[in-house]
Amino acid sequence: MSLTERVAADLINAMKSKDKVSLEAIRAAKTAFLLALSEKGPGSALTEEEELKIIQKLVRQRRESAEIYKSQNRPELSEKEVAEADILEKYLPAKISDEELTRVVKAVIEKTGAKSISDLGKVMGAAMKELSGKADGKEISAKVKQLLG
């Protein structure tokens, strides 16, 4: 079952259970999928990687909005955004541990032959491909900078 199909099935379940927070989050995902499909053109389909990137983008937007609401002293809106982000995160693959992230980034650094922080771009490109969907770009960047020193 593709991610788009899971979202459609969960949308129906959320409507039946009258869960407003889930319904809003899942509708946002479905809308984003439809928007991406319309941009690709007729007769095309989204790849699993594209679907994951869309969900990651939605989660990141919700988390950033929650931080803004929190800084503006609007806890009720912040809680809503966090709840939606948590619902959307269920569609993402499990995050990898810090030790696993370190191991993968070290392997990428060896493979690319990076020696200093000036090789950051080369390492980041390879690391993002390898860790797509498993770790956040900020986490990967921080780990690469830490290891390159």
Regions found by a protein language model. Name each.
Residues 1-149:
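Charged, compositionally biased, marginally structured helical/coil segments
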